[in-house]
């Protein structure tokens, strides 16, 4: 499989960001590691490429991928880790140069909840870009 150049470039940039900027609460995890988030990042970019998503949608997917499991407290169900990751993302954006995207916040906040609730929250977005493809 040949990985498209745009996917490679986005992956390298966001992987570097993940390694340098995103701190994980559960440092001794065997499952939910930076490597796990890097795999999610790669698969998200490959799917986004196949779907023909816009740059803005790809950037949102990348941000969600690198932050989504950063605030886990255990490797099991850990209901609430999505909201904690969303809050971490929001706080990070406030104090750094990463632009905040409410769709990214919602994708993470509902990451460990019923999909129907997350899809409903994203549907309420009025940005002209479907959040459903990000969820």
Question: Which residues fall in each region the model found?
Answer:
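Acidic/His-rich, divalent-metal-binding segments that scaffold phosphate/diphosphate chemistry
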Residues: 1-78, 82
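Divalent metal-dependent catalytic cores for phosphoryl transfer on phosphate-bearing substrates
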Residues: 57-135
